[in-house]
Amino acid sequence: MKTFLILALLAIVATTATTAVRVPVPQLQPQNPSQQQPQEQVPLVQQQQFLGQQQPFPPQQPYPQPQPFPSQQPYLQLQPFLQPQLPYSQPQPFRPQQPYPQPQPQYSQPQQPISQQQQQQQQQQQQQQQQQQQIIQQILQQQLIPCMDVVLQQHNIVHGKSQVLQQSTYQLLQELCCQHLWQIPEQSQCQAIHNVVHAIILHQQQKQQQQPSSQVSFQQPLQQYPLGQGSFRPSQQNPQAQGSVQPQQLPQFEEIRNLARK
């Protein structure tokens, strides 16, 4: 801005100087002293001032003010989200389906014999299981006959009866008993021992009923048979169903358990 003003002033001064130089010179008239009038010479400086007063400076055009930067338009405001959509139309309640048509009685009739067939199958299975158990018990009794003989031998030795086997036969029966006990599965050992105990008790009871007074006393040293521990006390009452042990049968049961452990 300042430089522009200085340049303007210099231009004005230059124009004034050129105008001053170009002042017209008065034409010389013939020298006639009578006609000549004294002319007052105006100093150059006054002329310049006079000219300067006559010609006023042209009004300086104002410097065009810089146009202000156009105000930036504010960023477009984000339009708010559209209003939430209308809620989904509520689902119409399901219409209860019509129940399926009930089966006709023709289909319900064959169901009854099916249940009867199931009952029959269950009964057959139970019968088969009972038969298998009976067969197993018979096999176990046959296998454990040596054990029964061993127990009877111990009973005869303790009570001094005449039916005493030789030591070699006794040992052989004892070995067979142990072998058979080891061959029997653990789940069936208990039942097998029960069967042997009941067989021994029945055997002794039958003998006592048939020959109550025909027992002959025969004593033999007990040291020859160290395994002959305990005593056999047969009961006069008939045993109950097989598979249960009565209190009076516990000693015999313990004897066979000891044999199985050995």
UniProtKB/Swiss-Prot annotation:
Keywords: Allergen, Repeat, Seed storage protein, Signal, Storage protein. Residues 51-73, 87-120, 225-251 are annotated as: Disordered. Substrate of transglutaminase. InterPro entries: Bifun_inhib/LTP/seed_sf, Bifunc_inhib/LTP/seed_store, Glia_glutenin. Residues 1-20 form the signal peptide. Gliadin is the major seed storage protein in wheat. The alpha/beta-gliadins can be divided into 5 homology classes. Sequence divergence between the classes is due to single base substitutions and to duplications or deletions within or near direct repeats. There are more than a 100 copies of the gene for alpha/beta-gliadin per haploid genome. This is Alpha/beta-gliadin A-I.
